[in-house]
Every structure is written in C-alpha cells, then in structure tokens.
C-alpha cells in the first residue's frame, strides 16, 4: 500500500500555518473512530503524487514520525481558487472491516447513436453513492451509452446490476439522456415574417379606411 509521510503539528497558530505552506507543506488533520483527532502536515509534492496515484477514494498509509501508521483516505481537500494551492487536507482513518458510504464519480463510455443524429447527450448524475468495504470502493463507475438513441435515457436502475457494490441512490435517478437537437429560429426569417405581417396589417387598415370614406355624389 502507498505510504505518505506526515508529522504532527504542535503549533496551530495562523502565522505558523501560513509559514508551513510557504515551506512547501500542507496542513491537515488525521481523525477517525479509533484515533484521536491529530493536526498533521505533509509535503505538498508528495501529497499531490499520492492523491493522483490512489485517486479520489483510494486507500494509503499515513506514516507519522512517531512510528504510528494509519490506513486512511482523503475525506476533504481545501484548495485556494486563486492559485490552486492546497490549503488543508482531512485524512480519515478507515476500519477495513466496516462498510461505509462513499461518493464515486460516474464516467460515460462509448458514442451514442443519437448524438450522431444530432441529439444532445446530457450527463445528469456525476457521482453515485455506494456502500461497501473500503477495499471494495471502485475508483469510478463507467456507464456505456453506445446504445442510446434520441429520446433514450439511463437511470440508476439500469446500471445497478453492473456495479459490484451496493448503490445507495434511488432507482429513478437519471444518469444520462439523449434529447432531440434544439431548433433555433433564424432571426432574419423572423424579422422578414414580422415585416410581412406588418405590411399586410397596414394594407388592411388602408382598405378599411377606403371603405369608411363616403363616396362622391354627382
């Protein structure tokens, strides 16, 4: 199992945390049902490599300087939106014998025939919640859309049998649809139709005026 080294943080003051980030480390916290909440820090480069290698719900060992090793997964990551710097990481110690709920990303696979006919593929459910042991958590759930025509859709009930773990979501939740292409009106044609209608209306008004005008008596 992948190992990420960490050290305990004794000083949690704001200026110390900022200095820690400036030195290339990410502050975080280790917690779980059987471990006391412990402030920690990890090297930013090492964390990024580990996170990319194991994936969103991947398991790895967090090795503390004092010799303690914990089976963990990343529960939450806080990122600065301005510079994409990792601000804080939550490491959750998992019990390998206890099932838990986890959100797993949904990926679409294949080319929908309906899309080739001009239809629009709408990916509606980007994550699915599964309930399973930590070792059985899938990295992602792949949904095949190669048989979807215009007007077709796939819901959770359609993919449940193909997923080897328990899906928590309701059966009627829609994962993906293929809808007919949107027809946009030609603004020039619309303007021309409006102009024609106005001309006809104006002509009608003139004719009405002529009918109302009294004729000349000889």
Curated annotation (Swiss-Prot):
Alphabetically ordered keywords of this record: Ribonucleoprotein, Ribosomal protein, RNA-binding, rRNA-binding
Pfam families, per the entry: Ribosomal_L25p, Ribosomal_TL5_C
Domain of life: Bacteria
GO biological process: translation
Region Disordered, residue ranges: 178-218
Record-linked InterPro entries: Rbsml_bL25/Gln-tRNA_synth_N (IPR020056), Ribosomal_bL25/Gln-tRNA_synth (IPR011035), Ribosomal_bL25_b-dom (IPR020057), Ribosomal_bL25_C (IPR037121), Ribosomal_bL25_long (IPR001021), Ribosomal_L25_dom (IPR029751), Ribosomal_uL5_bac-type (IPR020930)
SUPFAM superfamilies per the UniProt record, alphabetical: Ribosomal protein L25-like (SSF50715)
Residue ranges, compositional bias (Acidic residues): 185-195
Gene Ontology CC annotations of this record: cytosolic large ribosomal subunit
Biased composition (Basic and acidic residues): 203-218
Subunit record text: Part of the 50S ribosomal subunit; part of the 5S rRNA/L5/L18/L25 subcomplex. Contacts the 5S rRNA. Binds to the 5S rRNA independently of L5 and L18.
Family: Belongs to the bacterial ribosomal protein bL25 family. CTC subfamily.
HAMAP family in the record: Ribosomal_bL25_CTC
Role summary: This is one of the proteins that binds to the 5S RNA in the ribosome where it forms part of the central protuberance.
Protein name stated in the entry: Large ribosomal subunit protein bL25
Lineage: Bacteria, Bacillati, Bacillota, Bacilli, Bacillales
């Amino acid at each position: 199992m992948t190992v990420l080294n960490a050290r305990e943080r004794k000083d949690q003051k704001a200026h110390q945390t900022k200095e820690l980030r400036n030195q290339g480390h990410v502050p975080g916290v280790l917690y779980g049902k059987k471990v006391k909440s412990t402030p920690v820090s990890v090297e930013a480069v090492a964390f990024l490599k580990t996170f990319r290698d194991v994936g969103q719900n991947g398991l790895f060992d967090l090795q503390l300087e004092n010799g303690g090793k914990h089976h963990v997964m990343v529960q939450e990551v806080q990122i600065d939106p301005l510079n994409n710097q990792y601000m804080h990481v939550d490491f959750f110690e998992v019990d390998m014998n206890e099932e838990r709920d986890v959100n797993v990303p949904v990926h679409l696979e294949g080319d929908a025939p309906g899309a080739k006919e001009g239809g629009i593929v709408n990916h509606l459910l980007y994550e699915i919640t599964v309930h399973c042991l930590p070792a059985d958590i899938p990295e992602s759930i792949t949904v095949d859309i190669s048989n979807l025509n215009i007007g077709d859709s796939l819901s959770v009930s359609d993919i449940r049998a193909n997923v080897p773990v328990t899906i928590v979501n309701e059966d009627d939740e829609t994962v993906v649809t293929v809808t007919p292409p949107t027809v946009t009106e030609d603004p020039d044609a619309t303007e021309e139709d409006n102009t024609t209608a106005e001309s006809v209306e104006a002509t009608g008004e003139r004719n009405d005026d002529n009918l109302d005008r009294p004729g000349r008596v000889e």
